[in-house]
């Protein structure tokens, strides 16, 4: 992603909103801090208007979450894109539509179970390069690190050898 390396997952959405809230929280520590931030986000997050561009493909979303993945998991083991294969030379793009408060909770439950690809408002595709353009500036995360004002233009760099 423009000037910053990302090995696993980069994106924006409610997951980033939770991380931003955790970073701001001062009085509570550990898992409780994360859970409180998550609860706040579940009830206040409104989604991001974004455009996803990849080759000839152009689509707009009101995204609960939008990610470009090489790996399968974010955070403490949340399987954001179970179909992702780290050594296939492709970026897995996942976008989940934000469709109201009740649906946010439902989508989150699919996410926590690792079944987000089964969620009706989730979209997944493979590509070699993707741009995710929010209508307003927002914070993005790359491998869990937060960046403000970063242009999200991701591509696969070849060269890393994977041994299993």
Model-found features: residue ranges?
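Catalytic core of DAGKc-family lipid kinases
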Residues: 1-64
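Short beta-strand-to-turn element immediately C-terminal to the catalytic PLP-Schiff-base lysine
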Residues: 9, 20-21, 68, 96, ...
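Glycine-rich phosphate/pyrophosphate-binding beta-alpha loops
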Residues: 11, 15, 67-81, 146
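Short acidic/glycine-rich loop or secondary-structure boundary segments that cap or lie
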Residues: 15-18, 60-62, 74-77, 101-104
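Gly/Ser/Thr-rich active-site loops/lids in small-molecule metabolic enzymes
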Residues: 26-33, 76, 82-103
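Glycine-rich, charged/polar anion/phosphate-binding loops
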Residues: 36-39, 48-55, 76-81, 115-118, ...
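ATP/nucleoside-binding phosphotransfer catalytic cores, i.e., glycine-rich phosphate-binding loops
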Residues: 54-56, 60, 85, 95-164
């Amino acid at each position: 992603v423009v000037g910053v390396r990302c090995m696993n997952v980069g994106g924006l959405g409610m997951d980033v909103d939770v991380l931003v809230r955790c970073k701001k929280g001062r009085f509570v520590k550990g898992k409780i801090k994360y859970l409180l931030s998550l609860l706040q986000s579940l009830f206040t997050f409104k989604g991001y208007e974004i455009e996803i561009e990849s080759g000839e493909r152009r689509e707009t979303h009101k995204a609960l979450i939008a990610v470009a993945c090489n790996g399968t998991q974010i955070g403490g083991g949340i399987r954001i894109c179970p179909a992702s294969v780290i050594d296939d030379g492709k970026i897995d793009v996942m976008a989940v539509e934000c469709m109201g408060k009740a649906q946010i909770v439902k989508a989150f439950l699919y996410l926590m179970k690792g079944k987000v690809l089964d969620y009706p408002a989730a979209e997944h595709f493979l590509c070699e390069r993707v741009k995710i353009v929010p209508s307003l500036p927002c914070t993005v995360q790359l491998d869990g690190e937060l960046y403000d004002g970063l242009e999200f233009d991701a591509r696969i760099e070849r060269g890393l050898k994977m041994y299993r």
